[in-house]
């Protein structure tokens, strides 16, 4: 589990996260503790792991998460309903072209029948560009920022998400 590895082998990273948390501009998202597929196979185990992770984040950073990130961004309306019942206000989901069609990921959406759950859609293209093209220097910060600045004005939410492995963790 990444958070346990950071605590044991890189406590300075946890300390830097604590400093980020103090700014009030960052929220750490809850997820299944073991990065498991429990949301698909075992609701009770899923809820147990999510609570365990939310408890750990609250213990470390002094704030209980209100947003959720499922393993590999797995989503269904049923999973969203469970997440909402657990008290989360928002869930980060992947941009599924076969579902979204022409819709942009750069808006806040809502659950199909639990309207209080906000759905934040990962911008697949920008996330992958950041994750895979910065490291080999084929993408510069200036170019990346220009892409975001070039989005239509009404598309004012851009969610970039990637795993810790991108950062070498």
Residues of each region from the PLM?
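Catalytic alpha-helical scaffold of carbohydrate-active enzymes acting on polysaccharides/glycoconjugates
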Residues: 1-66, 73-128, 138-155
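Gly/Ser/Thr-rich loops at beta-strand to alpha-helix junctions
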Residues: 72-76, 165-168
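Active-site-proximal acidic segments at structured loop/helix or strand boundaries
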Residues: 154-162, 167-169
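Short, conserved catalytic/metal-binding motifs centered on acidic residues
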Residues: 68-71, 160
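Conserved NTP-donor binding/palm subdomain of two-metal-ion nucleotidyltransferases/polymerases, i.e.
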Residues: 130-133
């Amino acid at each position: 589990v990444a958070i346990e590895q950071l605590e044991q082998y890189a406590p300075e990273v946890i300390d830097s996260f604590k400093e980020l948390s103090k700014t009030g501009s960052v929220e750490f998202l809850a997820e299944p503790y073991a990065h498991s597929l429990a949301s698909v196979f075992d609701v009770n185990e899923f809820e147990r792991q999510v609570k365990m992770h939310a408890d750990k984040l609250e213990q470390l950073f002094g704030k209980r998460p209100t947003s959720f990130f499922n393993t590999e961004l797995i989503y269904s309306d049923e999973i969203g309903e469970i997440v909402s019942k657990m008290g989360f206000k928002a869930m980060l989901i992947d941009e599924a072209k076969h579902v979204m069609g022409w819709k942009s990921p750069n808006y806040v959406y809502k659950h199909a029948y639990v309207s209080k759950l906000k759905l934040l859609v990962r911008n697949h293209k920008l996330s992958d560009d950041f994750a895979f093209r910065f490291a080999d220097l084929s993408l510069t910060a200036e170019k990346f920022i220009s892409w975001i600045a070039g989005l239509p004005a009404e598309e004012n939410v851009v969610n970039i998400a990637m795993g810790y492995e991108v950062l070498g963790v």
